[in-house]
Amino acid sequence: MARIFITGSTDGLGRAAAQALIQKSHQVVLHARSSERAVALDDLAPWSAGVVIGDLSSATDTRNVASQVNALGRMDAVIHNAGAYSTKGRSPTPEGHPTIIAVNALAPYVLTALMARPRRLVYLSSGMHREGSSSLRDIDWSARRWSSSQAYSDSKLYLTALAFAVARRWPDVLSNAVDPGWVATKMGGASAPDDFEEGYLTQTWLAVSEAPAATVSGRYWHHRRPLPPAKEVDNPAFQDQLSARLADMTGVSLF
């Protein structure tokens, strides 16, 4: 059985993925943003391999999450499921970054760099990454007029490119991005039309399946089908420029 860490596992896709993996006797390490949010895991925690707590919008907390997971031992897979979408403006983090950018892009980058390297990495993307801006001059939105939807698209472009960069730079790791579709979660809303089950089962499939179709790297998946991502995602020059910018913003070097 595999050991899997899932960020953002108190609700939505992350919780569903955790439940599915626990039911198959995998060792799942859960994550909650705060002790208060961890109460939502009370029913799963006894069957899990541990619960780590930390707010991924905070650089300090994100580093601490990496330390907590490392203390539990090397994971076989990490599912970077946690995400944020805010319509309340830039919502700066303690370090001054927009919360959307911090949670959706900076935190997965830092966790990837600081956690013991797993065999598999799964990053939760979105079809909205195709509307992301390829300009990396104002990742922090310090000059642009704020747009939550554009910032979200940008963050998912960065995250998807990160998944492909890891696939290229770490050939011993299976790294993939997943578009779960527009599904009924707290973020997606109750009327979202896509298949919720396929949204989380694609994550778990990539995390643990030994099927030949799942043991590949550098792919963008939607409901267990590979799709072409935005052109920037598979561009080594863009990947390297993004990695350099994220290293500069976080003070953490990945490659």
Please give the residue ranges for each predicted region.
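A glycine-rich helix->loop->beta "capping" turn
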Residues: P46-W47, Q68-H80, S86-P92
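C-terminal helical subdomain
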Residues: A177, P193-A244, D248, V252
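Rossmann-fold cofactor-recognition segment
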Residues: A45-T60
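Catalytic loop of short-chain dehydrogenase/reductase
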Residues: G83-P92, P98, R120-D172, D179-A192
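Conserved glycine-rich Rossmann-like NAD(P)H-binding loop of the short-chain dehydrogenase/reductase
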Residues: K24-A40
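Conserved N-terminal Rossmann-fold NAD(P)-binding element of oxidoreductases
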Residues: I4-G8, H31
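N-terminal Rossmann NAD(P)H-binding glycine-rich loop of SDR-like oxidoreductase domains
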Residues: T10-G12, A18-Q19
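Ankyrin-repeat alpha-helix packing hotspot
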Residues: A105-L106
